[in-house]
């Protein structure tokens, strides 16, 4: 029994290293060299084919503009404060209940402060009234960083935070900031003046403004929303067109989206109210599958 075990151990040792034939694991040094060389060449060729394929593909892709941009959906409309459950609920006499909303607005508006827009090599004044879209050259063929339009916080009026650091929440008159999500090269097309009668808009018309309106979403909400005040450039209820098109993060890393502030001044207390805000334009679409495409709704409840 012991002899058989010793013989078995000897055969294993001989397989690992055969001193007579100079073999390691059944192969000579030359054999190991050939097989290793084969696999190095084999996997090297595979890696070369893979890298070459990637390089060819990258030559067809622009780092500045998507190849198939016609498949991009219309931009979404979103609100600040950004909340997970799209629900704003607070007590005006309890600062802790609305602290998170206020801090969210403050953080978002940091880049809109005058001190953040001082560099004249990056920012430029584009006027105090809405004007036509501002073209800044071809996206694909012209390199170099493009300038962006400044946006003044005081255009947001009561919701700017300049005079009320609670953005109306302390008084039970909450503000929300509305923005149109960035889409590369997108140029909003406002509705034509003669077609405005099809929209429930109570505002002055301007062909260079993409209008936005907030209303009660359900019939029972409409009488409970109360008065709504809008604050935007030039007193218009929407987004001025000179901030478009957007040229992307590489060409406009400091781009500022135009904003619209909305303040609800007399919401019914102790009632959950659903508010829908909607942008109107010829190339603004809506989808039942995406509730933020061109519109959004938020629940607001002011507790006594």
Curated annotation (Swiss-Prot):
Segments crossing the lipid bilayer: 35-62
GO MF term list: ATPase activator activity; ATPase binding; P-type sodium:potassium-exchanging transporter activity; protein heterodimerization activity; protein kinase binding; protein-macromolecule adaptor activity; transporter activator activity
Any GO BP annotation: potassium ion import across plasma membrane
GO CC terms: apical plasma membrane; basolateral plasma membrane; caveola; intercalated disc; lateral plasma membrane; myelin sheath; organelle membrane; plasma membrane
Topological domain ranges for the Cytoplasmic compartment: 1-34
Location of Phosphoserine modifications: 11
Tissue expression profile of the protein: Expressed in cardiac muscle and in flexor digitorum brevis (FDB) muscle (at protein level). Expressed in a circadian manner in the kidney and aorta (at protein level).
Membrane protein topology class: Single-pass type II membrane protein
Covalent S-S links between cysteines: 126-149, 159-175, 214-277
Major subcellular location class: membrane
Post-translational modification: Glutathionylated. N-glycosylated.
Keywords per UniProt: Cell adhesion, Cell membrane, Disulfide bond, Glutathionylation, Glycoprotein, Ion transport, Membrane, Phosphoprotein, Potassium, Potassium transport, Signal-anchor, Sodium, Sodium transport, Sodium/potassium transport, Transmembrane, Transmembrane helix, Transport
Protein location: Cell membrane; Apical cell membrane; Cell membrane, Sarcolemma
Modified residue annotations for Phosphotyrosine: 101
Function in brief: This is the non-catalytic component of the active enzyme, which catalyzes the hydrolysis of ATP coupled with the exchange of Na(+) and K(+) ions across the plasma membrane. The beta subunit regulates, through assembly of alpha/beta heterodimers, the number of sodium pumps transported to the plasma membrane. Involved in cell adhesion and establishing epithelial cell polarity.
UniProt subunit comment: The sodium/potassium-transporting ATPase is composed of a catalytic alpha subunit, an auxiliary non-catalytic beta subunit and an additional regulatory subunit. Interacts with catalytic subunit ATP12A. Interacts with regulatory subunit FXYD1. Interacts with regulatory subunit FXYD3. Interacts with NKAIN1, NKAIN2 and NKAIN4. Interacts with MLC1. Part of a complex containing MLC1, TRPV4, AQP4 and HEPACAM. Interacts with KIRREL3. Interacts with OBSCN (via protein kinase domain 1).
Entry protein name: Sodium/potassium-transporting ATPase subunit beta-1
């Amino acid at each position: 029994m012991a002899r058989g075990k010793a013989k078995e151990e000897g055969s294993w040792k001989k397989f690992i290293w055969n001193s007579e034939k100079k073999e390691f694991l059944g192969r000579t040094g030359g054999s190991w060299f050939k097989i290793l060389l084969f696999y190095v060449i084999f996997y090297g060729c595979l890696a070369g084919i893979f890298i070459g394929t990637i390089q060819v593909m990258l030559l067809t892709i622009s780092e500045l503009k998507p190849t198939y941009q016609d498949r991009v959906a219309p931009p979404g409309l979103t609100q600040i404060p950004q909340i997970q459950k799209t629900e704003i609920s607070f007590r005006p006499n309890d600062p802790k209940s609305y602290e998170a909303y206020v801090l969210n607005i403050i953080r978002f508006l940091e880049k809109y402060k005058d001190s953040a827009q001082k560099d004249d090599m990056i920012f430029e004044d584009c006027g105090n009234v809405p004007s036509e879209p501002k073209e800044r050259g071809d996206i694909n063929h012209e390199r170099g960083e493009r300038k962006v339009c400044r946006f003044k916080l005081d255009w947001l009026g009561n919701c700017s935070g300049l005079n009320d650091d609670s953005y109306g929440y302390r008084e039970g008159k909450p503000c929300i900031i509305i923005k149109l999500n960035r889409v590369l090269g997108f140029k909003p097309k406002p509705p034509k003046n003669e077609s405005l009668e099809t929209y429930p808009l109570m505002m002055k018309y301007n062909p260079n403004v993409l209008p936005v309106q907030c209303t009660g979403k359900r019939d029972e909400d409409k009488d409970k929303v109360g008065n709504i005040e809008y604050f935007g450039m030039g007193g218009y209820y929407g987004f001025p067109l000179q901030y478009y098109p957007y040229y992307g993060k590489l060409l406009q890393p400091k781009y500022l989206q135009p904003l619209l502030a909305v303040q609800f001044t007399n919401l019914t207390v102790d009632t959950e109210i659903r508010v829908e805000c909607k942008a109107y334009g010829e190339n603004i679409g809506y989808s039942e599958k995406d509730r933020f495409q061109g519109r959004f709704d938020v629940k607001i409840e002011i507790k006594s």
